């Protein structure tokens, strides 16, 4: 219980000395580790190109969902193109750059691709500036690349209409931020006592509790958590999205944060929720990766069949979810070949049992993948 008028966790005398029951968390932590290992083993068995596609899908989902948690909806095609451009993944035509999307992507990629580098105040300032390239959050000008100064009052997390707002949390005053962040960064970069996955949960909670910026704290906290998880796995490729799972459990996420931030430094409940959410993220990634895994299975089944580059390109388009119906004229247009060559390519795949005909025949004849048994 809190004593006196100490409402928030950072007001406690023992702040920021986190405590948790390792024994209570051991079973869940073991499930998380085993699920991580199984997923990584499975992904390492599908080939480099498909792993890159899986990584692209997950990073795209991570960027989209981390922003959605804060009520911001980004263009999926812009996010996917921005990530593909930076990682050098071939996805066909790229959508024109959007500097706001590029900034969010830059932060997420810096956290996961450069996870071995120390996290510093300057690096955090860079992430914050990338999130708000115009210097505004909506219509409000905010301090960019600098800690908040509380010029308009204490930093509060509120909900409800103006005049009847409910205060869910109030962060430490601005004059404490240099010390607060210095303590956090020292722990994050140096202290290796806690399990790496536990550290991810603590880092997320600690940063969002300090709430050092005018805006963007949640997204940066989740990027820091992803950075810690990437360190735990020692891999720059991501095959599950914790942010996507948090978005699915958004109400529970905010309820657990509020309860923890108004509690003591004993944070086993928070870590139990975090580990459970992480486990559900790993176990639920099948849906997101279904297309990539289906492609892997398809090419495994047809590995012994010689195909030309045009056939491989068009089959991959079908596997990725071709919009509309694939006709011989569309084949010729996409593959940049003559109608006769397109028809020979298609006939060859029909004879081998890779494709089947559909449609009414004649000019309306179209082709699709033969269902795999």
Task: Explain the meaning of each model-derived region.
Residues 1-373:
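FIC/Doc superfamily catalytic core
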